[in-house]
Design a protein with these regions (language model features):
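Conserved, well-structured core segments that form or line functional sites
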Residues: 2-195
Length: 195
């Protein structure tokens, strides 16, 4: 079956209101979709297979931004019921894409760490084939949350928006069910045992 023939269903925001560790594991293999305008003015949808996530499970998680229970303008959206975006800037240059998960008043989210492009406009795919640095379908090209958001043109304008096609970023399920492995989280040495 060709990629264009695969039947996908859009995940509703309520899908993200489940336990965060379950959501993080279930997101592996799902398809993150991004609607953009191509350089020729045409609308396109990039589809990226999610290959790596990290769960941040609230006030008891030393690596979570809301671990101390302190609500700030930046973390306020994490207290929302699952199904909205939490995007923040780190090191002043990298946007981090998080999907708020779990119930209301429980500040939890799933960081999308890595993925690879599986479908996009033919024009974009052809441009990528000409320049190895632009090959978004290469397994390592969107490896790392900063590379991922840069490649998909995601920034803080997405903060607080629902995870739906109306936001121009959404998640689909096309039936892919890869094996999932659990590993320590990356880049949170400050959280010691919370890795």
């Amino acid at each position: 079956m060709l990629a264009s023939q695969v039947v996908s269903s859009v995940l509703e925001p309520s899908w993200f209101a489940r336990p965060t560790c379950v959501v993080a594991a279930d997101l592996i293999g799902k398809v993150l979709c991004r609607e953009l305008t191509d350089s020729d003015g045409q609308q396109k949808i990039l589809r990226m297979r999610i290959s790596e996530t990290e769960a941040y499970i609230g006030e008891g998680d030393a690596a979570c931004h809301a671990h101390a229970g302190t609500r700030t303008p930046r973390t306020e959206i994490m207290y929302h019921i699952g199904g909205v975006f939490y995007v923040y800037l780190t090191y002043g240059i990298h946007h981090m894409l998080n999907l708020v998960s779990g119930p209301t008043e429980s500040p939890e989210a799933v960081l999308i760490r890595a993925g690879f492009l599986i479908e996009g406009s033919a024009r974009l795919m052809n441009e990528q084939l000409l320049d190895v640095n632009k090959q978004l379908n290469h397994i390592k090209q969107l490896a790392g949350p900063g590379k991922l958001t840069k490649g998909l043109q995601i920034d803080r304008t997405l903060y607080g928006k629902p995870i739906t096609p109306a936001s121009k970023v959404w998640v689909e399920d096309d039936g892919c069910q890869p094996l999932v492995s659990l590993r320590p989280r990356i880049g949170i040495d400050y959280a010691r045992d919370a890795k």
